[in-house]
Curated annotation (Swiss-Prot):
Pfam families: Homeodomain
Keywords of the record: Developmental protein, DNA-binding, Homeobox, Nucleus, Transcription, Transcription regulation
Gene Ontology terms describing biological process: anterior/posterior pattern specification
The protein, known as: Homeobox protein Hox-C5
Molecular-function GO terms, alphabetical: DNA-binding transcription factor activity, RNA polymerase II-specific; RNA polymerase II cis-regulatory region sequence-specific DNA binding
Primary localization class, coarse: nucleus
Family per record: Belongs to the Antp homeobox family.
Highest taxon above the source species: Eukaryota
Stored PROSITE patterns: ANTENNAPEDIA (PS00032), HOMEOBOX_1 (PS00027), HOMEOBOX_2 (PS50071)
Organism whose genome encodes this protein: Xenopus laevis
Chain coiled-coil ranges: none
Subcellular location: Nucleus
Cell membrane found in the keyword field: no
């Protein structure tokens, strides 16, 4: 059994990965495919479109928003690499 020797070892001070952090979202292949298709046509979404996609894919708006932010960063990085390779 774990003994608390110092006051800072109380639950308040002990950090757990699950406390305060959200777990990583795993997208199904179907969700990923639909998100990629949408990204192909629009890199930025209106709020209305984000709500539609969230409802269709059973995700929340925040997940859609963050997926698109991450995908834009990946796209930006990939285009930089391609332009360096062509020089």
């Amino acid at each position: 059994e774990f003994r608390q020797i110092y006051p800072w070892m109380t639950k308040l001070h002990m950090s757990h990965e699950t406390d305060g952090k959200r777990s990583r979202t795993s997208y199904t292949r179907y969700q990923t495919l639909e998100l990629e298709k949408e990204f192909h046509f629009n890199r930025y979404l209106t709020r209305r479109r984000r709500i539609e996609i969230a409802n269709n894919l059973c995700l929340n708006e925040r997940q859609i928003k963050i997926w698109f932010q991450n995908r834009r960063m990946k796209w930006k990085k990939d285009t930089k690499v391609k332009s360096k390779d062509s020089m």
